[in-house]
Amino acid sequence: MLPSYKNYPYLQQLSKECFNISNDDKNYRIDEQVVKIINKAKTIIEEENGLVVKDKIFLNGYSSSGVFAQRFALLHPDIIETAWIGGASGSIPIPTDDFVYPLGIADYESLTGKKFDLESYSNIKFRYYVGEFETQNKSDSRVDDFGHPAPMHDMSYFNRSVPTEVGKYQRMTLGTEMFTRAENTIKILESMGIDISHQIIWARSHNNRSGIGVNELGDRFINDTYNSTIENYNINLGRTR
């Protein structure tokens, strides 16, 4: 949905630099543009198809789009019922002043011009999932805190996604290893009353296109859900394929 341009704010992941984009740029506040698209889609569904849609959405994202979903939930918690996020366990936000955006909310008001809505955020059901072998693929351009190649899909080490010093502080506070960091993050969120779970899917990788990546499971789930939804819709209208 969103492109990634070199030397440009990381739109795909709602990086902090996205808030510095000029308001006359077509990509200004891309998150707010997505909200407008959602509202327009609701209007079309209701007015043109006569269907009733829920006030809040089911937000799904995997890998980069999972990171987008994490941050979109921070920015617009009032419109989300459930956030289903995969392959993004290294950068789970905590709505606290202990961290700055995109891992926390210390600078939230200065970036967005509004106060953080903790009540709405606390009403979101967060469901995280990640493959057991998520950290096995290594980057050829990033190193971890010990000088070794960093896990490719751990955004804590990717400065386009998480600013370098912010990532270092996160790892120092919550853990260098991604699964440990995620576990500690989940415990903090649970202590804050956030409805969150984190499932590790055994014997699965991030995405190697060989049939054992977690994303293949997600694609299958989405396709099956879409097909069953269309089938039920046609049955309710008295249609047959």
Give the location of each predicted region.
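Conserved alpha/beta-hydrolase
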Residues: M1-Y10
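Alpha/beta-hydrolase active-site loop
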Residues: C18-G50, I57
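Surface-exposed acidic, glycine-flexible loop patches that form ligand/cofactor-binding
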Residues: E46-V52, G113-S120, I188-M192, N227, ...
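Short beta-strand immediately N-terminal to the catalytic nucleophile in serine-hydrolase-like folds
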Residues: L59-G61, G86
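Short glycine-enriched nucleophile-adjacent loop
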Residues: G66-P77
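The feature captures the conserved acid-bearing segment of alpha/beta-hydrolase catalytic domains
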Residues: T82-M192
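C-terminal catalytic histidine-bearing segment of alpha/beta-hydrolase fold enzymes
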Residues: Y157-Y169, T176-R241
